[in-house]
Amino acid sequence: MNSLFASTARGLEELLKTELEGLGATDCQVVQGGVHFQGDTRLLYQSLMWSRLASRIMLPLGECRVYSDLDLYLGVQAIPWTEMFNPGATFAVHFSGLNDEIRNSQYGALKVKDAIVDSFTRKNLPRPNVDRESPDLRINVWLNKETAHISLDLSGEGLHLRGYRDGTGMAPIKENLAAAIVMRSGWVPGTPLLDPMCGSGTLLIEAAMLATDRAPGLHRGHWGFGGWAQHDDAIWKEVKAEAQTRARQGLAAYGSRFYGSDVDERVIERARRNARRAGIGELIDFAVKDVAQLNNPLPKGPYGTVISNPPYGERLESEPALIALHSLLGRIMKSQFGGWNLSVFSASPELLSCLQLRADKQFKAKNGPLDCIQKNYHLAESEGGKPAMLAEDFANRLRKNLKKFEKWARQEGIECYRLYDADLPEYNVAIDRYGDWVVVQEYAPPKTVDAHKARQRLFDIIAATIAVLEIAPNKLVLKTRERQKGKNQYQKMAEKGDFIEVQEYNARLWVNLTDYLDTGLFLDHRIARRMLGQMSKGKDFLNLFSYTGSASVHAGLGGARSTTTVDMSRTYLEWAERNLRLNGLTGRAHRLMQADVLGWLRESTEQFDLIFIDPPTFSNSKRMEDAFDVQRDHIRLMTDLKRLLRKGGTIMFSNNKRGFRMDHDGLAALGLKAQEISQKTLSQDFARNRQIHNCWLITAA
């Protein structure tokens, strides 16, 4: 009998144990990452040929304590390597694990290689050569703390490499994991199996091989026992011949079909090639089809199983499309596949909830570094029609707001407005419309809120938003932000450079919904910008802390004699220039200046009739000369502004400081007075958030 070890993906150990026992293995003991078992030579070869779940089959050779590199060398050399190698056999060493003495896996592999080679030279035998690419023998050494476990890897390459796949689509799963997903899906061989996002066909091919009794190792051309002196070629040939016979008989006897579809024509063609190489191509119907086009291939029966490993994104920007995809899949399952079973494997439990189905069973497994879950559902025969909306109370509020604001915005001549602003506390997001695009901004939840529940609620919000607004998922942009404390934090998010043109009254403006936390247009200042346009005719206009210059555009369109736009950011000044140019506002009358605004104010000697200033609540930028606090420093600011203000001129002063208190006495000492116009500058879409900004008109007393 041989003591053997089969490794597998985390989470599949018990399933592998059952499989090995079915092959005849005895004394099976589950450990993390695999199963120890006993078996004779025939069982050894059968496990290599027939295990659909094992990653590798290893023959343990010994172990040694490692307190130094010499201990490792001597421990390896104690194994009778000369009795193990066929003459001329090549080998490679795979070393994993570190300890205080062996701190580099390459160094560990080198010491093992030296010990093996020296075993031959000491006996005056030809030394074996190393072949890292395709060795005849593969030695596996795992160093766990102070113990090195030394094994002969009889698999050679990983057993997931069946020999039928020449390439994959994006984010593939290994074949042994695919086999486990099939085994856990509840699918019964002989009944239909459908994969609506099949990619390169791995799930369906593994299922078809299982159903037709085709051994997973039948198409492999290289093994790890070719140079093993104890290899019994006669028994191996018997095992292989039996597998070939069973595959022929299984294929001839199988009567059901498999169905696979994917939106990518090239991936489907690859799936067809893979299936043909696996010997089961005639059983699988592959089609180029989007999930939205999915239909039941057997509407009159029999019932079958839908199995899928849909995409699950790790980037925030991909989530709206994935949420919509899962919601769509759930709706199609309910409407067209009543009586069937569904099994979905995913790294995102939150996305699975978008199916709006109740799971009967669930399993956990690792897909590489990802913690994944597989959920099985039974689709009731009576399921059908329109499913209930996720987050129904949120959806109802959004629907109500849409009805109210859509007509109003059309009448106002604006394309950008707020549709929802945390109206319901449990749905803590802001939703803004920019033409036919929508931006959902999630306010970062408090640390006391369960992260999983918060993410789940966000997914519900996105699914409901897409449904209520009837928008394409790629027209929804998702952002997460702290509650805004001012406009000093223009955080860079991406480098897409995608700008869209929007209309605000008579102004055309560029917005960018993806590259920054903000979009280039502060919607709450819409009415203030219109007022500036109405006040600007024939005047010299100054825009300080100008951001993307939208106020300058309104002033220019309102007939300003000149506009001067000042900001410290080159990025935003270039954006402002694009906005001005889009509206035909070019030439010497429309200046843009990159400068520290506070420093520029102190040094400038120019005069202006109308000044708009919207400073940050607080800033200590390295490029500014000193820290700025709008509450503390606004009178100092007004001192500089007054010097630039012509007789009869007006300053429009706005900021986002909640609870801001104007120092009227300080203003009076400067010969100025302030009229608060905050409520006049708030439009309907910001009526619920009356403290989003405060705004003042400041003139000579």
Swiss-Prot record:
It is found in: Cytoplasm. It is an enzyme of class 2 (transferase). PANTHER family: RIBOSOMAL RNA LARGE SUBUNIT METHYLTRANSFERASE K/L, RIBOSOMAL RNA LARGE SUBUNIT METHYLTRANSFERASE K_L. Specifically methylates the guanine in position 2445 (m2G2445) and the guanine in position 2069 (m7G2069) of 23S rRNA. GO terms for cellular component: cytoplasm. Residues 43-154 form the THUMP domain. Keywords: Cytoplasm, Methyltransferase, RNA-binding, rRNA processing, S-adenosyl-L-methionine, Transferase. It catalyses: guanosine(2445) in 23S rRNA + S-adenosyl-L-methionine = N(2)-methylguanosine(2445) in 23S rRNA + S-adenosyl-L-homocysteine + H(+); guanosine(2069) in 23S rRNA + S-adenosyl-L-methionine = N(2)-methylguanosine(2069) in 23S rRNA + S-adenosyl-L-homocysteine + H(+). GO terms for molecular function: 23S rRNA (guanine(2445)-N(2))-methyltransferase activity; RNA binding; rRNA (guanine-N7-)-methyltransferase activity. This is Ribosomal RNA large subunit methyltransferase K/L. InterPro entries: 23SrRNA_methyltr_KL (IPR017244), DNA_methylase_N6_adenine_CS (IPR002052), RlmKL-like_Mtase (IPR000241), RlmKL-like_Mtase_CS (IPR053943), RlmL_1st (IPR054170), SAM-dep_methyl-trfase (IPR019614), SAM-dependent_MTases_sf (IPR029063), THUMP_dom (IPR004114). The keyword Transmembrane helix does not apply. Its EC number is 2.1.1.173, 2.1.1.264. Belongs to the methyltransferase superfamily. RlmKL family. It comes from the Bacteria. It comes from Klebsiella pneumoniae (strain 342). The keyword Disulfide bond does not apply. The gene is rlmL. CDD domains: AdoMet_MTases, THUMP_AdoMetMT. Signal peptide: none annotated. Coiled coil: none annotated.
